[in-house]
Regions:
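A Rossmann-like FAD-binding core segment of flavoenzymes
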Residues: 26-28, 68-95, 101-102, 170-267
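Short hydrophobic core segments
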Residues: 102-112, 236-244, 309, 388
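Beta1-alpha1 glycine-rich phosphate/pyrophosphate-binding loop at the start
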Residues: 2-73, 165-189
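A conserved FAD-binding loop/helix module that cradles the flavin
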Residues: 281-345, 432-447
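Flexible, glycine-rich terminal cap/loop adjacent to redox cofactors
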Residues: 7-11, 19-26, 34, 243, ...
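Rossmann-like dinucleotide-binding cores of NAD(P)H-dependent redox enzymes
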Residues: 59-60, 151-153, 159-218, 299-304, ...
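FAD-site-proximal beta/loop scaffold in flavoenzymes
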Residues: 124-148, 221-226, 233-311, 411
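Glycine-rich dinucleotide-binding loop and its adjacent helix/turn
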Residues: 109-171, 207, 261, 267-269
């Protein structure tokens, strides 16, 4: 049996610890985390800010006490300051000043990611916020109790930025959404889908400023008052910056581990790093992108983090399983418009030099004679021109089509071709779908 030290009790770390404790007896598990809480579901922050849920209690699914009841030792508010990989020792200091020198047989790095915060002039003004941790969301909500905060700008129109824009609008604030890209969610969807969301945002009263880069912030009496871009100045009372995340790699950025181009730890299919007995999971590590032939990449999603933690936990304890890679399956629901995607978009394929074809269709999910709860759905499938393997899909509707993307995720993982999809066995019942399902119709239209 082994002594296993886990640095970071976030989603990936939590999944790893639970996998070890629930399936293998006799191991000593010691965890360190710099935060005061475990397992906060950051995806729920926008719902909380937007008053779509009553509070944050349901956004936690694991506690220190639950870990300890299973036999783990957990040190909260105890950041790890140094790791001696040669001698297998972790050094940390608790909030009360207690020093820890913890030896290990196996080490799991689960340090997560950090928000990318550009150094804008005026960036230290009050009411310029970031949203990553529970404490960040609580601070925003507390500040929104101040009725003088009437106008909020969100910088960054990816998933999180779009969700926050909706949240601030639902909270009763005038809301601006700013991004230097020509539209929103450009990394997840092709323009025709992104424009659906952009129109949806505008129709719901959000002031969109795409194609504008932030230049600096201005303030008065220490508080932000103005957002200045390359195209204009906008009066604001709060700014939320959410332009992306980077691996939290301060503990291993000194060349002791092999790293990816963006600083994430390179891992193999067992979550092993370049050092013996050291594993990395979650946002601090790479994934294998099946839509790009299984090459290493970086996709910071909680779902990826959990899977990587499970894989590492089993391999550490002697059960050899491989991470099958990911397709980046994701989704978003804003003002009732639901959009899901996985794999490559057409634009992404062009960036990566992949020669692709696409097929698209807009149709109802159910039979056309169903008069209620049967809105249009738009689907786009991206497939390899030569091999005809499906590489990605995007779907948008006010109807919940999210389950369909799971099928496409598996199709990308398994190399299913567009031609195989044409005759997929999809049942027909008017309550559920049409005789020619929109998926089948799109496949049949493929060149």
């Amino acid at each position: 049996m082994a002594k296993i030290v886990v640095v970071g009790a976030n989603h990936a770390g939590t999944a790893c610890i639970n996998t070890i404790l629930d399936n293998y007896e006799g191991n000593e598990v010691v965890a360190f985390d710099a935060n005061s809480n475990i397992s906060f579901l950051g995806c729920g922050m926008a719902l909380w800010i937007g008053k779509q849920i009553s509070g944050p209690d349901g956004l936690f699914y694991q506690t220190k006490e639950q870990f300890e009841a299973k036999g783990a030792t957990v040190h909260m508010e105890t950041p790890v300051e140094k790791i001696d990989f040669d001698n297998k020792v972790v050094y940390a200091t608790g909030k009360d000043g207690t020093k820890y020198e913890e030896s290990y047989d196996k080490l799991v790095l689960s340090t997560g990611s950090l928000p990318i915060i550009p150094r804008f002039e005026g960036g230290d003004l009050e009411n310029i916020q970031q949203v990553k941790l529970f404490q960040d969301a609580q601070e925003v909500i507390d500040k929104l109790e101040d009725a003088s905060i009437k106008r909020v700008a969100v910088v960054g129109a990816g998933y999180i930025g779009v969700e926050l824009a909706e949240a601030f609008k639902r909270n009763g604030r005038e809301t601006l959404l700013v991004d230097m890209a020509p539209t929103c969610m450009a990394n997840n969807f092709d323009p025709e889908f992104s424009e659906m969301m952009a129109k949806n945002l505008a129709d719901n009263g959000i002031e969109c400023h795409f194609g504008e880069g932030v230049d600096h912030f201005e303030g008065k009496d220490g508080k932000v008052t103005t957002l200045v871009t390359n195209k204009g100045s906008y009066q604001v009372d709060m700014i939320c910056v959410c332009i992306g995340f980077r691996p939290n790699n301060a503990l291993f950025a000194d060349g002791q581990l092999d790293l990816f181009a963006n600083g994430a730890v390179l891992v193999d299919h067992h979550q092993k790093t370049s050092r013996d007995d050291v594993y990395a999971v979650g946002d601090c590590s790479t994934i294998f992108n099946n839509s790009l032939g299984g090459d290493p990449g970086y996709i910071a999603l909680a779902s990826n983090a959990v899977r990587s933690g499970i894989v590492a936990g089993h391999n550490i304890c002697g059960t050899e399983i491989e991470n099958p890679g990911v397709q980046g399956a994701s989704g978003i629901c804003i003002f009732d418009l639901k959009m899901v995607s996985c794999g490559l978009t057409e634009n992404a394929a062009k960036r990566f030099g992949v020669d692709v074809l696409t097929t698209s269709v807009t149709d109802t999910q159910k039979a056309g004679f169903i008069e209620h709860d049967n809105p249009d759905a738009t689907i786009k499938i991206v497939y390899d021109k030569k091999t005809r393997a499906i590489l990605g899909a995007q779907i948008a509707s006010t109807y919940d089509m999210s389950g369909t993307i799971h099928m496409f995720s598996l199709a990308v993982q398994k190399g299913v071709t567009i031609d195989e999809l044409k005759l997929l066995d999809i049942f027909f019942l008017p309550h559920f779908n049409a005789p020619y399902n929109y998926i089948t119709v799109a496949a049949l239209k493929a060149e």
